[in-house]
Amino acid sequence: MGRTGDLENAEFFPMTRRRSTSGTSSRSSTDSGLSVDTAYLEDNKHNNFANGTSGLTDETKYRDVEDAEADVDEPFLPTSSKKLGSGSRTRQIFWALVILCLGGWVLALVLFLTHGRASSQTASETLQQQESDSGSTSAGRPVTLQQVLTGSWNPRAHAISWIAGPDGEDGLLVQRAEVDKEGYMRVDDIRSQEGDDVDSQSGRILIDKAAVRVNGETLMPTFTWPSPDLNKVLLMSNHEKNWRYSFTGRYWIFDVATQTAQPLDPSVPDGRVQLALWSPSSDAVVFVRDNNMYLRKLSSESVVSITKDGGEDLFYGIPDWVYEEEVITDKSVTWWSNDGKYVAFLRTNESAVPEFPVQYFVSRPSGKRPPPGLENYPEVRQIKYPKAGSPNPVVNLLFYDVEKDEVFPVDVPDDFPDDDRIIIEVLWASEGKVIVRATNRESDRVKVFLIDTKSRTGKLVRFEDIANLDGGWVEPSHYTKFIPADPSNGRPDDGYIDTVIHDGYDHLAYFTPLDNPDPIMLTTGEWEVVEAPSAVDLRRGIVYFVATKESPTQRHVYRVHLDGSNLQALTDTSKPGFYDVSFSDGAGYALLSYNGPSVPWQAIINTGGDEITFEKTIEKNPRLASMVETYALPTEIYQNVTIDGFTLQLVERRPPHFNPAKKYPVVFQLYNGPTSQRVDRKFTIDFQSYIASNLGYIVVTLDARGTGYSGRKVRCAVRGNLGHYEAHDQITTAKMWAKKPYVDETRMAIWGWSYGGFMTLKVLEQDAGETFQYGMAVAPVTDWRFYDSVYTERYMHTPEHNPSGYENSTITNVSALSKATRFLLIHGASDDNVHIQNTLTFVDKLDLLNVQNYDMHFYPDSDHNIYFHNAHFMIYERLSNWLINAFNGEWHQIANPVPEDSIWDSVKRSVPAFAH
């Protein structure tokens, strides 16, 4: 799960040829603000649903099983004491087939006249869809599952690595060429493309060829990091993945001038290194091996041991599993000071953290051969995994004085106790000062400390009691920017820009001096900044950021002065847009990425003046634009619903050639984890698009209460009671959709993965078969006491403080789930994130009450992403086929089975018209 995220009018636009590659095409729209009185819906319960009819499909391979039931195998023919002759048996079968065909013809005629769903479409029906279509007019092919799973619909995107020039130049970027080309790694100066009057440098090759020879060995670097002075490059080969962000490898120092390399630690050339970072002065590398920290000064081949007691339970400079997954979302907890004189790093002690065994039945991820006699036993990896309420790792901040070769802590007053401290950010200022942000275990109290490493003292400079402010929490973030003093530009003191809560929304605040708790607000309003600030132009005193100012579903780029004045948009806000941006070191240039709703594109722009005078498009995605012209894509309808006073964002995906006179099955797809977002304006062709385009079903996604970017009122409503309000919102919206004239209320399903899997089960539990007949839950949490402490307690408090909340959030009412027609459970057997314990204990509850209306599939050795062997392709095929069978009514046929004792019984079951 991990940390994986106001529109008044609904907009109707087809994802078809009417999209433009520039992202500026207009779209037809219609207003649609929906509200509902939930008390009314609670008093108007639906009756039990009849057996499902055959599903809406565009291809005959998804036809109902009725077509195959005429060919009955001989073992299922009736038996009696008198043996039937072949003629008698043939005549019986013949007349049964005649009756079956006549009944099927009559039934098909009735269903056709009443606009019922046929198992395949006729030409006149297809024409009728085209004529009544409100969106797509393309006669192209439907999206295929193979295309989605192989990334054929993924936009091509360039990730530019901006780098500061050795002499303060702005606009330098690092690029890597194809492996078989010369000039494998080079630094280019984007200023050289602006014009003759711009002072710039020519490109410089850092690594000529990808293959590097060291002591007779050929290396193929997986990752490369140039030194700040661009004279050396840190290479990593022999990559091995650890957790989500972390990995290990062999590291090398490459000399640009001689095009030669040497081991990072010449005494241990084959040692696997967990982390390596250049010093700002380019004369040293700090690295971690076997959980201990080391320093390699380039002036010597010897290595200095910074720590010596690191080991299985003690980490230096790198996070343990839970910090990597839920707090830092990175592989490093090591920070060089700006002058290269100090290194700050975390010491993580997880000796008190209980272990969870992850078993591997097919593979051996460790790469080790088992001892003789144990070849037939699974490999077990013991993970230090703190579940809710269990001991957390104890984390302390330490400092290393490079010149004195000394490690020291700094005690600060008013710090959190060891068992109630989460350090979420460390930021170096100037003159050896450090800003440290920490929270309590439940993430609802924030303390900001200012530490002076020279005097080895510290003090508390800010305290925020989030629990008393709005009852919510604070998310870990790592975007705080240090603003150095510059009296000539009106900044007499050092400061920093942080994201704070202001009138119920996340906004930017400028704190100066460093110990001033009262900021200058840079942004305000009923919208939020996102992962901000993006960059700061210190010369001009301008802050750049991305925000939801136009709509929670959009992202635009803005700038504002450090005094909070002159807020301006850099992107075109007159049209829906979802932008991302990365700035050069001095914020004079940027890579602007348009990610939707039209075909994505990328351009490099200059931002150093009042106007953008330079723009170079580096990606237009022509292949993707051509595919959009060729394929019949769903129509996306963005709107909002208002439930219990909360305005929530929603997108409905309609099949191509949508016909409002027909009735369509509906699939609700959700994630709905706290602060997450699934309803946005990005260009996305995914599994949901495949369902709408290829299977012909409507897909609805609602960001219910608890989701992000709509303000803290919406976000914090779920605290302490995960699943309750989110499920209520999904069910309420589904009841609204069930009343729409084009929706088949007898064929409604819901599905999700991870938190979405939890929500699928919670919805089915709360709904008890009234609205949703089907559900598909992948890797679900079923009891929050089984999930990791940092994530869970942020939103639920500890089990000790909130026992009733944990009980309410657990999937316990399996009797309610038994009222659904059927549901599907899927889990990776080696999931290190959401443990298979969740699904197995839930299945035990089903067993105890003899609940049998479910299917289950486990994927051996797959983690939370379910990729091992053929799992990635198979799981989506499984989901697709299961859903087709559900909407074709086949799961009705396996409920309460009875043996067939005559051909006539088979006929009656095959032709519902004869069953009455």
UniProtKB/Swiss-Prot annotation:
According to the record, the segments passing through the membrane are: 93-113
The Low complexity compositionally biased stretches are 21-35
Q: Which GO terms describe its cellular component?
A: fungal-type vacuole membrane; plasma membrane
UniProt key word Hydrolase: yes
- Reaction equations catalysed: Release of an N-terminal dipeptide, Xaa-Yaa-|-Zaa-, from a polypeptide, preferentially when Yaa is Pro, provided Zaa is neither Pro nor hydroxyproline
Q: Which domain of life is it from?
A: Eukaryota
The GO biological-process annotations, alphabetized, read as:
proteolysis
Protein name, per record: Probable dipeptidyl-aminopeptidase B
Gene name, Swiss-Prot/TrEMBL? dapB
